[in-house]
Curated annotation (Swiss-Prot):
Record gene name: Zfand3
Chain positions recorded as Zn(2+) 2 binding sites: 157, 160, 181, 184
Compositionally skewed regions (Low complexity) per UniProt: 49-59, 66-77
Ranges of biased composition (kind: Polar residues): 78-94, 111-127
Record Gene3D superfamilies: 1.20.5.4770, AN1-like Zinc finger
Keyword Nucleotide-binding on entry: no
InterPro entries, alphabetized: AN1-like_Znf, AN1_A20_ZnFinger, Znf_A20, Znf_AN1
Positions of AN1-type zinc fingers: 151-200
Protein name: AN1-type zinc finger protein 3
Keyword DNA repair: no
C-alpha cells in the first residue's frame, strides 16, 4: 500500500520541449516530428558542405604557398638592383655638390669682366661724346668757309650783288658774317652755315628760371616773417 501511495504521489515527468515550442521525445533527439524530419533532410547537405569548404581551403592554402614561393624567388633578384641604386646616388651626389660651387665661381668670373667692360665702354663714350659734338658742328663749316670768299663790300648783296641801303644792310646782315638783300636774307635762301637752332637752344637754356633748392623743403608759418 505504501508503495502505491508513493508512486501516486510522484508527479508524471513532462516530455522535453522542441525549440519550436512543441513537445518532443527522446527518440527524436528532443525534437518534434516536423523538426526531426527537417533535420534528417539537411544532414546530406551538411555533409557535403564541409567537404567543399575543405576543398576550397586546400586550394587557397596551395595558392598562398605558391605566391610565397614566387615572392621568395623574385626578392633576391630585385635586392641587388635596389642596393645598387643608393650606391649610384651616393656616388653622383658628391660630384654634383662639388661641381655646384665650381659652376657658381665660373659664372661669377665670367660675369664680372663683362660688367667692367660695360662700365669702361660707358666711360669712354661719356668722355668722347663732348669732344665729338663740337667737331661735328665745326667740320661742315670749315669747307664752306674755305670755299666762300670774303665779302668785299657790305653795300651789295653777297648772293645777287644788288645795291643795299643802310637800312637794308642792317636788316640783311646774317650771323654767318655776310650781308644779303631782302630776297636772300633768310638762312634757307642763302644756305647759311650758322647753326641757328643750336644757338636758340643754348639761349633758351640760359634764360630758363633756376629754382632754389630750398623751395618745397622748408616750412614756415604764415605771419612769422612779418613779426
Amino acid at each position: 500500500m505504501g508503495d502505491a501511495g508513493s508512486e501516486r504521489s510522484k508527479a508524471p515527468s513532462l516530455p522535453p520541449r522542441c525549440p519550436c515550442g512543441f513537445w518532443g521525445s527522446s527518440k527524436t533527439m528532443n525534437l518534434c516530428s516536423k523538426c526531426f524530419a527537417d533535420f534528417q533532410k539537411k544532414q546530406p547537405d551538411d555533409d557535403s558542405t564541409p567537404s567543399t569548404s575543405n576543398s576550397q581551403s586546400d586550394l587557397f592554402s596551395e595558392e598562398t604557398t605558391s605566391d610565397n614561393n614566387n615572392t621568395s624567388v623574385t626578392t633576391p633578384t630585385l635586392s641587388p638592383s635596389q642596393q645598387s641604386l643608393p650606391t649610384e646616388l651616393n656616388v653622383t651626389s658628391p660630384s654634383e655638390e662639388e661641381c655646384g660651387p665650381c659652376t657658381d665661381t665660373a659664372h661669377v668670373s665670367l660675369i664680372t669682366p663683362t660688367k667692367r667692360s660695360c662700365g669702361a665702354d660707358s666711360q669712354s663714350e661719356s668722355e668722347a661724346s663732348p669732344v665729338k659734338r663740337p667737331r661735328l658742328v665745326e667740320n661742315p663749316e670749315r669747307p664752306e668757309e674755305s670755299g666762300r670768299s670774303k665779302q668785299k663790300s657790305r653795300r651789295r648783296c653777297f648772293q645777287c650783288q644788288t645795291k643795299l641801303e643802310l637800312v637794308q644792310q642792317e636788316l640783311g646782315s646774317c650771323r654767318c658774317g655776310y650781308v644779303f638783300c631782302m630776297l636772300h636774307r633768310l638762312p634757307e635762301q642763302h644756305d647759311c652755315t650758322f647753326d641757328h637752332m643750336g644757338r636758340g637752344r643754348e639761349e633758351a637754356i640760359m634764360k630758363m628760371v633756376k629754382l632754389d633748392r630750398k623751395v618745397g623743403r622748408s616750412c614756415q608759418r604764415i605771419g612769422e616773417g612779418c613779426s
